[in-house]
Amino acid sequence: MTSIARRTLLAGGLAVAAASLAPVALAAPAQPWLAYERRLRGLLADPPDGDFDEDFEQTLLDLNNLIRRREGAPPLAWDPGLAAAARAHAADMAVTERFDHLTREGYSPAGRVGLLARDLVGAPAENIAMRRNADGAVRPDQIMNQWRDSPGHRANLVAPSFTHVGYGVLRQGPRVIAVGAYAEVAARLAGPAPLRVRGPDEIARALSNAAPPIRQFSVSEPGGEVLTVTYVEGRPPNVLRPGAWQLRPHLSSGEHRYQLGWGPVFVLE
């Protein structure tokens, strides 16, 4: 289980100044991130030695919401971008035989969600499981019970702040690899953000019709916490170095107060 479901709080009038006092964020190299995105989309189109099981995935959602109802937590809604991130990681683990939240290259759930859920602003988390029964096919309740009986995984199942989920289940003969991608969705873009951009103004345009409105944002290295402030509505955008970045929108949480969310990964060319 992994979770980065956290948002940094900024005082509105001090948001730019406070972030500028932090160490300067560095862009990640662009080509590895572009290659990872291609790899994930290729796995979605052609899963290795098996197929994605949509019925299994939907049953996991039903079982998860049953657990949440018993705990007094609101139900989770299905999100196709989160489901894409979950499916892609399940297939990637099947290829690499590395069953972890981090790939060998160090790509995290935040990076996967940022690459594939391109209209989502939120705080992601992830559960993973692999199972092969001695007799009979693996069932959804067996995977859900594995997570329910693990404190860390259970925390993601019942976290009241999470609003959306996508499950990815790859069935390879008797083996099932399952991934749950969870998020507290704080905002939606009107459409998918572009992966490749020429400047911060293109990202600002992608945010222009977000709901609720996003009028300023920072960026970090994908999955990173060190920020560079690049845009405040009505001010000229700051210069940003080429490379891979992750959008960190400033979400209003009251008068003159903002929280930093997690948004799409983009490559500045």
Predicted features and spans:
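N-terminal secretory signal peptides and thylakoid transit peptides that target proteins
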Residues: M1-V16
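Boundary at the C-terminal end of the N-terminal hydrophobic targeting segment
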Residues: A25-A27
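Short, well-ordered surface patches within globular domains
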Residues: P29-G114, A159-G166, P174
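A well-ordered secondary-structure block
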Residues: P109-E184, E221-P222, P236-H250
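Short domain-boundary/entry signatures in modular proteins, especially
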Residues: A183-G191
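Beta-strand-enriched, solvent-exposed domains that form extended recognition/catalytic surfaces
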Residues: A190-E269
